C-alpha cells in the first residue's frame, strides 16, 4: 500500500518534468545550432575537398556535433559517423594518413589489397544508409539551424 501523498508527489514530479521537457529540448537544439554556426569554416573546408578526406581531418569536430545533436538526429549521426570512423580505421590499418592522398588518390606504395580495402571503406561513405543519414543531418541544419553543411 502506498503512502497517502505518494500519488500527489508522483503527479507533481511528472507534471514538472513535462513542463520542463520542451525547454530542455529547445536548449539542446539551440546549443546544437550554435555549434553548427560556429563550425561554418570547417564545413566550408569539407565542401572544398571533393575527395572526402576532409571528413577525416575534421572527425573530432563532427563527433562533437554528433554528441550535441538533438535526440531526433542521434541515429543519423551514429550512421554517418560510423562510416567515417570505419574509413579512418581502414586507413590507419593500412598505415596511411588522410594527408597522404593526392587529389583523392591513395599513395602509390599501397598494395592492391590495401587499395581495395580502402576503396571499399570509402564506398561505404556513399552507401544509401549513410547518404540518407547525411541528408537528414543537412536538412535539419538547413531548416532549423539555417546552416548549409555540404556533407
Where are these regions (language model features)?
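Sec-dependent bacterial lipoprotein signal peptides
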Residues: 1-23
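C-terminal amphipathic alpha-helix
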Residues: 39-47, 103-151
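Alpha-helical segments in soluble extracytoplasmic regions
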Residues: 39-99, 115-117
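Short, flexible coil/linker elements and helix-boundary hinge sites characteristic
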Residues: 4, 92-95, 146, 150
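Ser/Thr/Pro/Gly-rich low-complexity linker/stalk segments immediately outside membranes or between
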Residues: 27-35
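Bacterial signal peptide processing site
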Residues: 25-28, 146
Amino acid at each position: 500500500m502506498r503512502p497517502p501523498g505518494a500519488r500527489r508527489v508522483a503527479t507533481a514530479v511528472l507534471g514538472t518534468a513535462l513542463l520542463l521537457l520542451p525547454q530542455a529540448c529547445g536548449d539542446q537544439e539551440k546549443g546544437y545550432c550554435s555549434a553548427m554556426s560556429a563550425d561554418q569554416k570547417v564545413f566550408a573546408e569539407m565542401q572544398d575537398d571533393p575527395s572526402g578526406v576532409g571528413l577525416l581531418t575534421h572527425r573530432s569536430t563532427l563527433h562533437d556535433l554528433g554528441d550535441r545533436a538533438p535526440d531526433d538526429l542521434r541515429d543519423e549521426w551514429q550512421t554517418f559517423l560510423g562510416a567515417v570512423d570505419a574509413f579512418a580505421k581502414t586507413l590507419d590499418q593500412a598505415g596511411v594518413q588522410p594527408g597522404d592522398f593526392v587529389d583523392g588518390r591513395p599513395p602509390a606504395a599501397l598494395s592492391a589489397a590495401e587499395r581495395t580495402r580502402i576503396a571499399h571503406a570509402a564506398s561505404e561513405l556513399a552507401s544509401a544508409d549513410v547518404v540518407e543519414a547525411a541528408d537528414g543531418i543537412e536538412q535539419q541544419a538547413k531548416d532549423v539551424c539555417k546552416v548549409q553543411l555540404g556533407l
